[in-house]
Amino acid sequence: MKTTATSFVTGERVVVFVVVSRILLSLPLSLISHGFSLFLLSLSAFLVEIRVETSPFLLSHFSSRRGASSGILLGAVTLPSVMISKLVQLSRAISIHEAEQDELAHVTMQYWAASASCCAILIYLSVIMSQVRKDESLSSSSIWLTRVSLTGTVLYGVACFVSLSMISHTGLNTSLKMLWMLFHGLAAVKLIRHLLCTFPSCASIGEALLVTSGLVLYFGDFLACTIAKIFEKLIPVDLVSISYGIKRTETGIIVQGLLLGLLLFPMVFRFVLHIYESSLRKRDARQRNCSDAAKSVLFFVSLLFFMVVAVPSWMQFVHDFNQHPFLWVLTFVFSEPLKRLSLCIYWILLIVVSVSRFYNISRSSKVERILLRKYYHLMAVLMFLPALVLQPKFLDLAFGAALAVFVALEIIRIWRIQPLGEPLHQFMNAFTDHRDSEHLIVSHFSLLLGCALPIWMSSGFNDRALSPFAGILSLGIGDTMASMVGHKYGVLRWSKTGKKTVEGTAAGITSMMAVCFVLVPILASMGYILSQGWWSLLVAVTATGMLEAYTAQLDNAFIPLVFYSLLCL
């Protein structure tokens, strides 16, 4: 029995428990119902994770990433924790009249949407596991875990209904919001099944859960914004104003349009390719597929039309641009040409020199790949830290453009679109690690997103000056120093099977605190609001460092979000 109880307590779970407890203890009375729902979600995710890891054959038809734990608990609580921390921050803003109720209500809806996605996936996993009860190898305790986890997720749904009814004006309003949450849940279940089947062995269940909930939330916001524009006279005014009535910046609309447009493009191209091949078969029954050259031409023409005509049309529709969005981007860049063009030139030179240098090292040297990849983390610090201090609005747009380029290149690589597909595949393989696969290379995406998301989420009111730096500090400084020091000087390991060392973790935590000590007076001199205590910062940095030490999940994705959520408190 002791062995079983000990196996339930892992380093990653303890850190997640500390993070969730820190968030719950920071909640004002107005967010108690949200905190109760987060507690229920955490409990259900914990039980589902135990159930999966004690009987891994239950989800054997999902080919998750090898060598990683399921990560269900961490994956389920990360995005809701970020949203509830943002609610805590907005509650402080409203108390000093620095934010409006509409913004708080908008983030509240986003919290429940993200939570509903995670809750639905947990219910889906519980249902799958409960269907394997006929197997004689299942113990009574395993069945009990399944029942309790399913009960917890149902109670979570009840808490969601009660909370939404309290902030709604009418029963119809509550019903519409519950339907909206149900839509997010169903979409999340459908999407996670698609991701795990289409990209086998590319992600753990927890990583897939985080990606799924994030994509569903982003697409849901896109869809609601569009529907509100089309049916603003038909949809009740209170629903539109509460859910999606906040002011949207031009940069936010452009980034959202670019990224979602590129994510939707593969479906569009499949449809176009199907029509083209059908027309070929009508002309010649012996010709089944188009040639590679024709496919490449069709791909680039479709991509150009979709991104230059279709996507900007949506941007202009939802935001009323007075010119083409790409022309707006040029106007924005040249509004401060010396600063922004100089920054672009600096980035280009740094990228060219670094990539060519590291690529040659990877081919001719015996430098371990993990250390080589950490050099890119340092490069991210050199690129993004000065820009975030000096040109934060321009950096928002630059992150969106860089991610759009990465998504487009990954689509070309996966489909081997001539003439770039095969060279891209060979080049990318030089920088992959055990978390990448032939199907999908995620390292560059996760690093860029890990740095970008805290910056994007810090737009608007922000009384925690260090929160936009969460990704840069945790990945560029903390994770890099932990890996390099641990690799060269580490002796004491946190676990017998893991590679993370006590020395590396200590170096990561110390380096992050040191950079914070340097950043704080610089930000204060530039007029940033500084209201975070040093003890709170120490807790956030320490918890982040311990999560990096214990987690087997994709740290580039989880660590910045956890650090950001703790910094917002």
From Swiss-Prot:
Lumenal side: 44-67, 130-147, 200-207, 274-296, 362-369, 415-440, 486-508
Disruption outcome: Pollen tube (PT) overgrowth inside the female gametophyte (FG) without PT rupture. Degenerated pollen grains before maturation, during the early tricellular stage.
Record has Transmembrane helix as a keyword: yes
InterPro entries tied to this protein: Polypren_kinase
Function: Essential for pollen development. Involved in protein N-glycosylation in the endoplasmic reticulum (ER), especially in the female gametophyte. Mediates pollen tube (PT) reception in synergids through protein glycosylation.
UniProt keywords, alphabetically: Endoplasmic reticulum, Glycoprotein, Kinase, Membrane, Transferase, Transmembrane, Transmembrane helix
Glycosylation sites recorded in the entry for this protein: 289
Family membership: Belongs to the polyprenol kinase family.
Protein name stated in the entry: Dolichol kinase EVAN
